[in-house]
From Swiss-Prot:
Segments crossing the lipid bilayer: none
Role this protein plays: Plays an essential role in the initiation and regulation of chromosomal replication. ATP-DnaA binds to the origin of replication (oriC) to initiate formation of the DNA replication initiation complex once per cell cycle. Binds the DnaA box (a 9 base pair repeat at the origin) and separates the double-stranded (ds)DNA. Forms a right-handed helical filament on oriC DNA; dsDNA binds to the exterior of the filament while single-stranded (ss)DNA is stabiized in the filament's interior.
Matching Pfam families: Bac_DnaA (PF00308), Bac_DnaA_C (PF08299), DnaA_N (PF11638)
GO BP annotations, alphabetical order: DNA replication initiation; regulation of DNA replication
Organism expressing this protein natively: Prochlorococcus marinus (strain MIT 9515)
Name this protein carries in UniProt: Chromosomal replication initiator protein DnaA
Quaternary structure and interacting proteins, as annotated: Oligomerizes as a right-handed, spiral filament on DNA at oriC.
SMART domains per the UniProt record, alphabetical: AAA, Bac_DnaA_C
Gene: dnaA
Location(s), subcellular: Cytoplasm
Length: 463
């Protein structure tokens, strides 16, 4: 590994100007240059978690900075020191943006040459495969049905309708079916889309007089995987076109897999004929996992990250987060990040305070909240406490008020004072807005959690 490299040094300088100091010091500075060949920049990170975090949150930012320095396209790969030192055969953590770019180019090629069946039209998450799905009593039937459909599509269970609450594994099973089919038959045309994408494609095709393109995209596939079908609610024209698409595929013997947060009969304003179609195959529901399954999920996640979690910590996390798998895995990720950055051991005693789902996890000062929020959103502290109604500022201010309410003992009027003398009703409204968005907007939920993590790390360092 090379100690220094002029290109990476320049990229770091550019990133330091564009990122907040905590973000740069925590994530970018520890990354070490490895090599730069044929437009591929390889960086070494302290551990697998840091590689994964950089890939998810900073790969595109690093690539853009590198492209600005080099003057041509750059892709970034992250390797952990453990994998490098152990000559591990684990695949490199490749930029998600690179994967997305490849998917976009494949989809474009598919649209331009629909007769070339070796060019796939799917857009599947590489992690959502059967071997990574932990089967429990809550999901055994859905898993068995998904595997049966993957092995023999268009036969017994057509359509396969998978239903269950948020974050229980519906999307994972759907995409696992797609991966399985592509692995068995590389020429299979597999398409995974959300209902919102289906509706958006339909609207665009109408505007551009391109219904033939739309029909070709959706009716020429061998396997259609459509997520969040509950969003068909009240969309009459979209329901009409989906009904026609469904019939065309079904009559051609093609497999249809549908996912929803509820059974067909419970989706409001859904046409009876669609309810009938959705119910004619198999409806398989997924329930929240029991504690044994949750512990197995955490242990599998730890194995994938090559970590050895104490059993009492696994049991603690599994007992604390019971509503869905996404929340459970998020808790694991936060715990690993916290231990990695602070250097504290992975024990219940050190991890428990920052895993409280209803609080910041530590007591913080108003100044800490304002600094972390302003740094995170790249606004000044003065703007944050001002009366500015610019959207970026007002959104940051609402999140700041929410975090201050959770992390301090201040009353609503006192929080208002910290934000430039705002009325307590303004603070109450801001908190309510953030609470609503936490359950409906993944981006806001991610932003809030990242700032919580930064506050926890900052407070621990000052202990």
């Amino acid at each position: 590994m090379q100690a220094t490299n002029p290109i990476w040094a320049e990229v770091q300088q550019l990133l330091q100007k564009n990122l907040s100091k905590p973000s740069f010091e925590t994530w970018i500075r520890p990354a070490k240059f490895n090599c730069f060949e044929n437009g591929l920049l390889t960086l070494i990170t302290p551990n697998n978690f840091t590689s994964d975090w950089l890939r998810k949150n900073y790969s595109e930012t690093i690539e853009k900075a590198a492209e600005e320095i080099c003057g041509h396209n750059v892709k970034v790969i992250f390797k952990s020191e453990n994998n490098v030192n152990n000559n591990s055969n684990i695949p490199d953590t490749v930029s998600q943006q690179s994967i997305k770019s490849q998917t976009r180019s494949i989809s474009t090629s598919q649209g331009n040459n629909t007769n070339n069946r070796t060019k796939k039209s799917h857009s599947l998450n590489i992690r959502y495969v059967f071997k990574r799905f932990v089967v429990g009593p809550n999901s055994r039937m859905a898993h068995a049905a998904a595997l049966a459909v993957a092995e023999s599509p268009g036969r017994e269970f057509n359509p396969l309708f998978i239903c269950g609450g948020v974050g229980l594994g519906k999307t994972h099973l759907m995409q696992a079916i797609g991966h399985y089919r592509v692995e068995i038959d590389p020429e299979a045309k597999v398409l995974y889309v959300s209902t919102e994408t289906f509706s958006s494609d339909l609207i665009q095709s109408i505007r551009k007089d391109g219904m033939h393109v739309f029909k070709n995209k959706y009716r020429s596939v061998d396997l259609l995987l459509i997520d969040d079908i509950q969003f068909l609610e009240g969309k009459e024209y979209t329901q009409e076109e989906f009904f026609n698409t469904f019939n065309a595929l079904y009559e051609a013997g093609k497999q249809i897999v549908i996912a929803s947060d509820r059974p067909p009969s419970q989706i409001p304003k859904l046409q009876e004929r669609l309810i009938s179609r959705f119910s004619m195959g198999l409806i398989a529901d997924i329930q929240p996992p029991d504690i044994e399954t949750r512990m197995a999920i955490l242990q599998k996640k730890a194995e994938q990250e090559r970590m050895n979690l104490p059993r009492d910590l696994v049991q603690f996390i599994a007992g604390r987060f019971s509503s869905n798998i996404r929340e459970l895995e998020g808790a694991f990720t936060r715990a690993v990040a916290f231990a990695s950055i602070t250097g504290l051991p992975m024990t219940v005693q050190s991890i428990a305070p920052m895993l409280d789902p209803n609080s910041v996890g530590v007591v913080v000062t108003p100044k800490q909240v304002i600094k972390k929020v302003s740094d995170f959103f790249s606004v000044t502290a003065e703007e944050l406490v001002s009366s500015s109604r610019r959207k970026p500022v007002s959104q940051a201010r609402q999140i700041g008020m929410y975090l201050m309410r959770q992390g301090t003992n201040l009353s609503l009027p006192k929080i208002g004072d910290e934000f430039g003398g705002k009325d307590h009703t303004t603070v109450m409204y801001a908190i309510e807005q953030v609470e609503k968005k936490l359950s409906s907007d993944p981006n806001v939920a991610s932003q809030v959690q990242k700032i919580k993590d930064l506050l926890q790390i900052d407070s621990r360092k000052n202990l």
